[in-house]
A protein has these predicted regions:
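Core catalytic region of metal-dependent phosphoesterases/phosphodiesterases
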Residues: 1-38
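Conserved beta-sheet core of the metallophosphoesterase superfamily
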Residues: 22-26, 33-38, 45, 50, ...
Length: 152
């Protein structure tokens, strides 16, 4: 299990005043490690390339994941490739609260929605969406299928 901190649990409400790493999400790995320590089939992993970006392999494919508040789906592949010198096969993003799939330089960019749907802030900026998530099926060739799961 990897976690990617985002903008929803920052300590300071105004994003202009918030510092990177100052949010409650950074506590999640510590909490999960303590709570899951007796489950031998669950590992809570640390992000090694950058605190806000996870990188891991599934069936030989390189997956990178971020919350998405600092990324744009159309150029995230280029950004990650230039930052780390590794071109991902799949990029997972959230933040936009809606499911989506695009292909950028043969890399699949998958956006997952919000489990809880729209909150008060989302409504105030007219970004209303039903609760939804994605489920990815990945084999040795990459993304085989992407399920668009509606949770309403």
């Amino acid at each position: 299990v990897y976690t990617t901190p985002g903008n929803h649990s920052r300590i300071v409400a105004k994003k202009e005043d918030a510092l990177d790493g100052e949010n409650m999400d950074v506590l999640l790995p510590f909490y999960l490690k303590a709570r899951m320590q007796n489950f031998k089939n669950i590992s809570i992993m640390d992000n090694r390339i950058e605190p806000e970006i996870a990188m891991f392999c599934i069936r030989g494919k390189t997956i990178m994941a971020a919350h998405g508040h600092k990324d744009v789906p159309a150029n995230v592949v280029q950004s990650f490739t230039m930052m780390f010198g590794i071109k991902p096969d799949i990029v997972l993003l959230g933040h936009r609260h809606t499911n989506g799939l695009s292909t950028v330089f043969d890399t699949k960019v998958i956006q997952s929605g919000c489990v809880s749907g729209s909150d008060e802030y989302a409504v105030s900026i007219r970004k209303v969406n039903m609760p939804e998530q994605t489920v990815s099926v990945i084999d040795e060739n990459g993304l085989v299928c992407l399920y668009d799961i509606q949770l309403s």
